Regions:
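Short gly/ser-rich loop at a beta-strand->alpha-helix junction or flexible surface loop bordering the NTP-binding
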Residues: 1-173, 209
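Surface segments flanking catalytic/ligand-binding clefts of nucleic-acid enzymes
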Residues: 1-3, 154-241
C-alpha cells in the first residue's frame, strides 16, 4: 500500500508540474502508472477531460482547454497571463492550434489555426509568446479598446516593439490590426490614457500624448495644441505601470 501511495503522490506531483493539467499520452506512462492514474480519477484526486486529458481539481480552465486542443493560449487569455491590462468584460478562451482538423470546441473556446505554431511542452505554460499573442489580439478582437490598452502597456514597458508586432500581422484581420497598431503609443501610462486617445481620435480632435511642458513636466495629453489634459493622479502613477 505504501508503494502505491508513493506512486500516486509522484503522479500528482507530475500533473502539478504541468500547471495542473496534462494529456496522459504526453507523460509516456507505463501500464502500471496508467492504472494508478485511472484510480486517481475514480477517487477524485484527478479529473478526466476530453481527449485523454487529466487535471487536478481546481485547475485553471484555460489551461485544461489548451491541453485538450494541444494549443496555446492567445488574445485576452494570454494578456491575463502576461499581466497586461485590458477592458474588462465577458471573456472567451482563445487558443492557437496548428491543425484545423484536430478537435472541435468542447465549450465556448475560440480556435485559431496557425500551421506554423508549435505546441507547448507539458511542463511549460501553454501560452503564445507575447508578440505573437498581441498580434493575434489586434487581429481578432472586435472592439478596439482591449487590444490597444494591452499593446500600449507592452510598448510602454518595452516588452515589445511596434516593428515586432507589424512584422507578425499577416492573414485575416491584418488590415484592422495595422490600423490599430498605428494608433498605439508607448507614452501611455494607463488604460485611461489609451481610452482618452481613442475618444479624441473618434471626435476628430488633434492631440499629442506624453508632452513635456517647461516648468510643469510631462502631461498626459495636449489637445488641439493648447488644452492640457491630465487624467491620472498620483495614486495611479506611483505604481509600476
Amino acid at each position: 500500500m505504501g508503494s502505491m501511495n508513493a506512486m500516486d503522490a509522484d503522479l500528482l506531483t507530475v500533473v502539478r508540474g504541468c500547471y495542473g493539467a496534462v494529456r496522459i499520452r504526453d507523460l509516456e506512462l507505463t501500464r502500471t502508472q496508467r492504472r494508478h492514474v485511472a484510480s486517481l480519477v475514480r477517487t477524485g484526486e484527478l479529473i478526466a477531460h476530453e481527449h485523454g486529458v487529466v487535471s487536478l481539481p481546481g485547475a485553471e480552465r484555460a489551461v485544461v482547454l489548451a491541453r485538450i486542443h494541444g494549443g496555446l493560449l492567445s488574445c485576452q487569455a494570454a494578456m491575463r497571463y502576461y499581466d497586461l491590462p485590458f477592458a474588462e468584460g465577458s471573456e472567451q478562451v482563445h487558443l492557437v492550434v496548428s491543425d484545423s482538423g484536430r478537435f472541435a470546441a468542447v465549450g465556448r473556446e475560440v480556435i485559431h489555426v496557425d500551421r506554423s505554431q508549435g505546441s507547448a511542452s507539458p511542463t511549460c505554460f501553454p501560452v503564445q509568446a507575447l508578440p505573437e499573442a498581441l498580434a493575434r489580439f489586434l487581429r481578432c478582437h472586435l472592439q478596439d479598446d482591449s487590444p490597444l490598452i494591452a499593446l500600449d502597456a507592452a510598448l510602454h514597458d518595452e516588452r515589445v516593439t511596434a516593428e515586432q508586432i507589424r512584422n507578425l500581422l499577416r492573414g485575416p484581420g491584418s488590415a484592422r490590426a495595422l490600423a490599430r497598431l498605428d494608433r498605439a503609443s508607448d507614452r501611455a501610462r494607463s488604460p485611461l490614457e489609451t481610452l482618452a486617445r481613442m475618444d479624441l481620435h473618434a471626435a476628430g480632435l488633434s492631440f499629442e500624448d506624453g508632452v513635456e511642458i517647461e516648468g510643469v513636466g510631462e502631461v498626459d495629453l495636449v489637445v488641439e495644441g493648447w488644452v492640457v489634459v491630465e487624467l491620472d493622479g498620483y495614486t495611479y502613477h506611483c505604481d509600476e505601470y
